[in-house]
Amino acid sequence: MKKAILSVSNKTGIVEFAKALTQLNYELYSTGGTKRILDEANVPVRSVSDLTHFPEIMDGRVKTLHPAVHGGILADRNKPQHLNELSEQHIDLIDMVVVNLYPFQQTVANPDVTMDEAIENIDIGGPTMLRAAAKNYKHVTTIVHPADYHEVLTRLRNDSLDESYRQSLMIKVFEHTAEYDEAIVRFFKGDKETLRYGENPQQSAYFVRTSNAKHTIAGAKQLHGKQLSYNNIKDADATLALVKKFDTPAAVAVKHMNPCGVGIGDTIEQAFQHAYEADSQSIFGGIVALNRAVTPELAEQLHSIFLEVIIAPKFTDEALDILKQKKNVRLLEIDMTIDSNEEEFVSVSGGYLVQDKDNYVVPKEEMKVVTEVAPTDEQWEAMLLGWKVVPSVKSNAIILSNNKQTVGIGAGQMNRVGAAKIALERAIEINDHVALVSDGFFPMGDTVELAAQHGIKAIIQPGGSIKDQDSIDMANKHGIAMVVTGTRHFKH
């Protein structure tokens, strides 16, 4: 029987994963809180102490730091000497290590964190097990991200958990532990940047870089301009997150954490022109992100309007010469790599909330046409564009889009009809090719009726209301094509 050690701080999916492992004939060993959760779920699991024959001591500081654990992980199965030594010492082989670390980054992100709290959240045993298992990836499967549970189980079931895949998991482990160590170094070095002020002049603020992630705002290379302000950083982060969703050339403009214009095109110049035309008034003083290099032609377009920050993966030398004529504009060069395992957290009174970032995009084949009329190809393109954008808009959110740009955005309203009114009234165009996109379901048919009054012929929304049929009936009454996705995208 194969053996697996499970010790996780992020309990997402661990019960289901552990149950599946037992069905695949794995014997499970665990520690502390992870074992308690598995015990409560009636998952067969033994204590790591049953391997080490040594109790957890020092409030759990020493649990897995033992030859019985690390010998079983590090043994080279192809070396008889290693196997003989294990046998002599009565040590069992460990075939899988599932570990994620104490939440150091989240802990120190709290501005009121104490030194003792920070120190207690420095994981020792976890990184040691991860690094040992990753080193021996030819024989041991190492999982650090819950997002990998599903594929590991699939590969175990179809016997495709090969060395190449285990190596890919190994790389994730060393990336994770490197970022973890970097966060510790940054915290104790006091790596924080004092900002002029916070959201308003009466608020003090500073920027703490908690990891060495080169594809984030924290790791951006500033090529020109004044120091980034608190609001610049927040807006730039929102802009970057949205532009990364696009594979085709794309441009995103953001004001006050909401996109005001999003455009795509065959070239990055076309994409920016579409984003600019989407709302040429609101883009003034905004943040713009582009997912292609800034060319001289594009630089001339950008230079012609007032922007606070311009973000791109690269600026040509000539483009920089043009843009640097404005001494205050901030130019940020950023790796546009997407990290599917990113988390986000927000402080609340007495604590903070942590969640995975809302990066999920429903595949078109999983969306469902619920009306008598089906969308045209152009309407589908408009819907899919808008569906990428709407998670970045404050709820309640309604977007109008065609197949190349947003044409109207209603953000942050207390009711869905109000958001729709704003989007429809501000729309630069409405025709049969424009789609209305909603981040949440319609509680009744009034939003669809309002859309029909303005000539909308295609709607995409999550569905899920007990009165879904009212909206569907209203769409059918007006010959509107409606698609439901089954996934909402609230943003608070």
UniProtKB/Swiss-Prot annotation:
The keyword Cell membrane does not apply. GO terms for biological process: 'de novo' IMP biosynthetic process. InterPro entries: AICAR_Tfase_dup_dom_sf (IPR024051), Cytidine_deaminase-like (IPR016193), MGS-like_dom (IPR011607), MGS-like_dom_sf (IPR036914), PurH-like (IPR002695). The keyword Lyase does not apply. One of its GO terms (molecular function) is IMP cyclohydrolase activity. One of its GO terms (cellular component) is cytosol. It catalyses: (6R)-10-formyltetrahydrofolate + 5-amino-1-(5-phospho-beta-D-ribosyl)imidazole-4-carboxamide = 5-formamido-1-(5-phospho-D-ribosyl)imidazole-4-carboxamide + (6S)-5,6,7,8-tetrahydrofolate; IMP + H2O = 5-formamido-1-(5-phospho-D-ribosyl)imidazole-4-carboxamide. Keywords: Hydrolase, Multifunctional enzyme, Purine biosynthesis, Transferase. Residues 1-144 form the MGS-like domain. Pathway: Purine metabolism; IMP biosynthesis via de novo pathway; 5-formamido-1-(5-phospho-D-ribosyl)imidazole-4-carboxamide from 5-amino-1-(5-phospho-D-ribosyl)imidazole-4-carboxamide (10-formyl THF route): step 1/1; Purine metabolism; IMP biosynthesis via de novo pathway; IMP from 5-formamido-1-(5-phospho-D-ribosyl)imidazole-4-carboxamide: step 1/1. Its EC number is 2.1.2.3, 3.5.4.10. Pfam families: AICARFT_IMPCHas, MGS. Disulfide bonds: none annotated. The IMP cyclohydrolase activity resides in the N-terminal region. Belongs to the PurH family. This is Bifunctional purine biosynthesis protein PurH. The gene is purH.
